[in-house]
Regions:
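A short aromatic-anchored loop/beta-hairpin motif
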Residues: 2, 21, 30-33, 37-219
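Bacterial N-terminal signal peptides that target proteins for export
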Residues: 6-24
């Protein structure tokens, strides 16, 4: 379900991505949680965090996640999978993005922003989007938000037929069983409810502060 880069070098967008060290590779979404190599001690039972936001606290010790806001796409006994929603890294014509996937799309219009989705497998692409448009492989998450990893949805966006709200990411954040719970217990993250206005807001630099304003008692 991951998008595959054909290694075409025709776009300035991909040139800027390559400068940041990002390329694409094809892998199976079913392996996301099972491939997490690091295992943690089981933590106390936490509520399911699917569809919620993880907000890095000032005590976050990992600089890769400093002031990050992560949308949790999946959280279960096998671990957790999420996407950083406040780290744009590049912008370019959506037609160039499609060419990078080997998709020739005539009359593709508009530009698209590429976001850093997390430090794991930064060669993998994802669309987090409103669920008004869904494909066969789309995953409905919660509260009107879905995730898709099919370039056909990018093509639909390029022709004005895509979802009303979306973010395109490279990479993801992944946790082994008990790992995320341990980090929350260590006060690296706190958890807040999500809403589409925050997730898909255009001012990425404000999202962390907006999430801070939504702060609840840590789970």
């Amino acid at each position: 379900m991951y998008w595959r880069d054909r290694r075409k070098k025709s776009s300035s967008l991909w040139a800027s991505c390559r400068a940041l060290g990002y390329v694409f590779a094809g892998l199976s979404l079913a392996l996301l949680l099972s491939d997490l190599a690091v295992r943690s001690e089981p933590a106390d039972q936490f509520e399911n965090l699917t569809g919620k936001l993880l907000v890095a606290t000032p005590e976050m010790g990992d600089p890769r996640f400093a002031e990050s806001v992560i949308y949790v796409v999946k959280h279960n006994s096998e671990g957790a999978f999420g996407l950083v929603i406040n780290r744009p890294i590049a912008k370019g014509p959506v037609g160039d993005l499609l060419k990078g996937f080997g998709v020739e799309s005539k009359d593709a219009k508009g530009e698209i922003i590429i976001h850093y989705g997390g430090p794991v497998s930064q060669n993998q692409g994802f669309l987090l989007h409103s669920d008004d448009v869904l494909l066969e492989d789309s995953t409905k998450v919660k509260d009107g938000i879905a995730m898709t990893s099919d370039p056909k949805l990018i093509e639909a966006i390029a022709h004005g037929k895509g979802p009303r709200q979306y973010l395109f990411m490279l990479g993801y954040a992944g946790w082994a069983p008990g790992q995320l719970e341990g980090e929350i217990h260590a006060a690296a993250w706190f958890v807040v409810s999500s809403d589409k206005s925050l997730v898909f807001g255009q001012e990425a630099e404000k999202k962390w502060h907006q999430a801070i304003d939504k702060r609840q008692i840590p789970l």
